[in-house]
Amino acid sequence: MNNLKQGKFITFEGGEGIGKSTQSQMLYEYLKSQNTPVILTREVGGTAVAEKMREILVHEELLPMSELLQAMAARYDHMVRKIIPALQDGHIVICDRFIDSTACYQGLELENGIDLVYNLHKTLMPSLMPDITFFIDVEPDTAIERVNLRNMSNKFDVRGIDFYKKIYDCFKELSNRFPERIKTIKASDLSPLEVHELIKKHLYTR
C-alpha cells in the first residue's frame, strides 16, 4: 500500500476493550494530517439506518439467525450508501469492525456460521473486502479489565471471560485463515502510540 492517495479499505478488528476505536481514530487523524482523502466509519452502523439497527443489535437479545441477518442488513446499507461511494471517489476508508466481527460475534452462534457469514457477504457484495485488516491482539484477561473501567456497556461487554476468550480465539483463527489480509498487532503490553506506529509501518511497507 505504498500509494495511500488511491482508495483503500482498512478495517480494525478484535474483541471488546482492545483499543480498536482508538487506533481507528489515530490513523484517521494521521492520514488527514498528510492531506490524504480519508473517512472514518464503524460497524454495526455508519449510516443513519444502520445506526438504528445497531441499537437493536447491541442491546436486545435476538435469536442467533436474526442477529446475523440484522448485522448483514446494516452492512449492506453501510456499503452501498457510504463505503463504496467513498472508495470510488478515491478515499481511504477506515472502518472500526467489518465482516470479521460478524463472523466471530454472530457466526460462532450458528452451525457452520463462520462460513455462512462470508458466503452471505459474497452474495451481497462479491467484490468488496478490506485491502488490509488490523487485528489488535490483546489477551482476554487484559481486555476485560479495560472494559470494566468503562462507564458504558452493551450486551457483549458484560458476557464474561469465557465469551471474551471465545471471541479472541475466533479472531486468531481468522488471522491464520486470511494471513495476506489480516495483520496481527500484539498490543497487550504496548501503548496506543506504539501500536499506532506499528500500524503505520505495515501500511507503508505493503
Curated annotation (Swiss-Prot):
It is an enzyme of class 2 (transferase). It catalyses: dTMP + ATP = dTDP + ADP. Coiled coil: none annotated. One of its GO terms (cellular component) is cytosol. One of its GO terms (biological process) is dUDP biosynthetic process. PROSITE patterns: THYMIDYLATE_KINASE. It comes from the Bacteria. ATP binds at G14, G15, E16, G17, I18, G19, K20, S21. Phosphorylation of dTMP to form dTDP in both de novo and salvage pathways of dTTP synthesis. HAMAP family: Thymidylate_kinase. This is Thymidylate kinase. It comes from Rickettsia felis (strain ATCC VR-1525 / URRWXCal2).
